[in-house]
Amino acid sequence: MQSSSEHISDVLIIGSGAAGLSLALRLAPHCKVTVLSKGPLNEGATFYAQGGIAAVFDETDSISSHVDDTLIAGAGLCDKEAVEFIASNARSCVQWLIDQGVLFDTETSANGEERYHLTREGGHSHRRILHTADATGKEVETTLVGKASNHPNISVKERCNAVDLITSNKIGLAGTKRVVGAYVWNRELEKVETFRAKAVVLATGGAAKVYQYTTNPDISSGDGIAMAWRAGCRVANLEFNQFHPTCLFHPQARNFLLTEALRGEGAYLKRPDGSRFMLDFDPRGELAPRDIVARAIDHEMKRLGADCMYLDISHKPTDFVMQHFPMIYEKLLSLGIDLTKEAIPIVPAAHYTCGGVMVDQHGRTDLDGLYAIGEVSYTGLHGANRMASNSLLECLVYGWSAAEDILTRLPTAKLAKHLPDWDESRVDNSDERVVIQHNWHELRLFMWDYVGIVRTTKRLERALRRINTLQQEIDEYYANFRISNNLLELRNLVQVAELIVRCAMERKESRGLHYTLDYPDQIENPQPTILHP
């Protein structure tokens, strides 16, 4: 019998960004799909993506060039097979997006033909970024949300946080261990509900909220990585956290990202005295990969004792800047900064989680019936450093690939007959919520200071000791008090913080986004860092 707080579908998708919604739309003609969104439907990282989507649309470009650029940016740790798989399926997946109604910017060629306007970003040897001005993510997410919201086979649940996955062995079912559903905190009703499904997909995004400064929306708390780990899945390469080099330094807009496309179109990075510095660090200057640019900015800030560096595109024509970057122009103007006339104060900020839950080419994890797609996953695409505009692409390709696999397996997949309700009989309401707030701030501050852009073994050891103490406090709190949104996110962030530090301690070299003063050189024949539960 189905209880009032139980929901049943063929496929449960946890997350409502480009990965989750593209998968839902591909599945929906064939089965019943439930999509969980932590906040409003369009609140994920996809909505805020400014840059674009990398795909070969220019006849002078090639898939092999896209592959080579990605391998170079990944600093020797990309899985070449995964890179080739994604690059070779890029155009068809972008075309699917266009067919859904996404409008990318176009231009008129010299012979009068209309074609897509392609921009170039750091690490790319060709112009291959399709974009919608400087708000590509907003266009993609708005289109997918509109389609999903109106599809009769897609049920969307907003303001719902997954608490944990339910596995067959935990409820006494015989046979191979598999995922059978999830417990979900309904923030509107303030109660935990049960979701049953034949397949569960994690499309929960990354874990950048583990750091004090981040470009990500508030919901990026590593939920999927933590839940998969607790359910018995391996994770990989979590030491590689990308810090976006150019986040606006302003008290009223702490997580506003300034797209790489600004540098792609000629913006300079400058010291407070107006002098350029990137050519001192890399011959590619402002177009060097993000890890090099972020470290250079961090180095100059520390060397000069400066609060920030500056990004300057004021030497470009005003019309050009306003046409290409209208959203950024308006946002900065509202803060009293004129992009066309002055340099913008910037700092690096946590931006993207390159590692994640280990998956195969269809997004399958170690747990039967459980998939992970998008930023939550480790596919091997990004290696030690993600190249600009490859992330939305990965979401789309794995949304397609996972859908193919799920639809093949659904006819023989079994739905669990009954799942136990969430048990709150032995917990009370908390009278110490200040504990959560304190631990939250402490975690994000020491992760920024000790596990940030530049690391040392002592800093990592210090962070791990703090994490162990926090975990004990949070586990005790979780066992004794009713859950809340902040408690759920903190529990997951502390778990992911531990995994990040453990991965970082295992890598005895500096490579890509992982830079440690104790091991400044690269080793030969590097391997992914894989942790087993």
From Swiss-Prot:
Q: Which InterPro entries match?
A: FAD-dep_OxRdtase_2_FAD-bd, FAD/NAD-bd_sf, Fum_R/Succ_DH_flav-like_C_sf, Fum_Rdtase/Succ_DH_flav-like_C, NadB, Succ_DH/fumarate_Rdtase_cat_sf
Where are the catalytic residues?
Answer: R290 (proton donor/acceptor)
Its main subcellular localisation, reduced to a broad class, is cytoplasm
Q: In which pathway does it act?
A: Cofactor biosynthesis; NAD(+) biosynthesis; iminoaspartate from L-aspartate (oxidase route): step 1/1
User: Is Ribonucleoprotein among this UniProt entry's keywords?
Assistant: no
The record's keywords, sorted A to Z, are: Cytoplasm, FAD, Flavoprotein, Nucleotide-binding, Oxidoreductase, Pyridine nucleotide biosynthesis
User: Which top-level group of life is the source organism from?
Assistant: Bacteria
Q: Tell me the disulfide pairings in this chain.
A: none
> What family is this?
Belongs to the FAD-dependent oxidoreductase 2 family. NadB subfamily.
Name of protein: L-aspartate oxidase
Identify the species of origin.
Yersinia pestis
